[in-house]
């Protein structure tokens, strides 16, 4: 199911359960300040789940993924909550609860599954823009391409992506490879002629920042 990127987080949590809080940050998120300051800004906030654009069904009934949530019991649409999760924080006890619920058969897009299950289970769910602070707005943090212009200090920006042509020409072949630190995939594209394949990588170890 699309929106299942909470599973790598849960795997890490189960292998490393000693933290109080776990932050997830997509690789196209940028903060115009010190990341340490961002974490400190949220340090005094005890919410089990912190994210952005936290909305209930009444506020945004046309959101696409409300119906993806399913499990052992029915949570009415009016009781469901969604968030926007390019950057979010979960407490250790919240992750333990989510893991338990998934083990019972719950599933859904993580932007509805996480906030809904947690609020329904009595955990605290809060917006990053709470307590009078402003860490994002619609001009800095969105699912749409951002307008160009001067960046505001101390704000979360998303998406930070390079623009690509609207009709990207695909090669005849697609090579999908699971790669790690000692991968030889760089050699595959060397040669005098342009290779007739697109290369897509699945990184299976901790070498994310040095794999290309």
Placement of each model-derived feature along the sequence:
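C-terminal catalytic/acceptor-binding lobe
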Residues: 99-210
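Conserved catalytic core of nucleotide-sugar-dependent glycosyltransferases
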Residues: 31-112
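Short, surface-exposed basic-aromatic patches at helix termini and helix-loop junctions that form
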Residues: 14-17, 36-45, 119-123
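Active-site-proximal specificity loops/subdomain of glycosyltransferases
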Residues: 1-17
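Short beta-strand-to-loop acidic/aromatic patch adjacent to the donor-nucleotide binding site
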Residues: 19-28
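Short, amphipathic alpha-helical segments
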Residues: 3-6, 29-33
């Amino acid at each position: 199911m699309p929106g299942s990127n909470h599973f790598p987080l849960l795997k890490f949590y189960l292998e490393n359960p000693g933290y109080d809080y776990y932050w997830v940050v997509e690789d196209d998120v940028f903060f115009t300040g010190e990341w340490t300051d961002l974490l400190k800004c949220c340090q005094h906030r005890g919410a089990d789940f912190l994210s952005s654009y936290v909305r209930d069904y009444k506020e945004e009934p046309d959101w696409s993924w409300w119906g993806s949530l399913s499990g052992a019991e029915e949570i009415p649409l009016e009781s469901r909550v969604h968030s926007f999760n390019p950057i979010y924080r979960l407490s250790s006890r919240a992750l333990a609860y989510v893991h338990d619920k998934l083990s019972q058969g719950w599933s859904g897009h993580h932007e509805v599954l996480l906030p809904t299950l947690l609020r329904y289970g009595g955990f605290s769910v809060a917006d990053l823009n709470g307590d009078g602070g402003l860490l994002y707005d619609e001009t800095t943090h969105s699912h749409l391409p951002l307008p160009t212009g001067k960046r505001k200090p101390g704000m979360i920006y998303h998406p930070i992506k390079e623009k690509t042509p609207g009709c990207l020409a695909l090669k005849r072949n697609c090579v999908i490879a699971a790669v790690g630190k000692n991968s030889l995939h760089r050699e595959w594209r060397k040669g005098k002629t342009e290779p007739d394949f697109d290369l897509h990588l699945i990184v299976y170890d901790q070498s994310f920042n040095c794999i290309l």
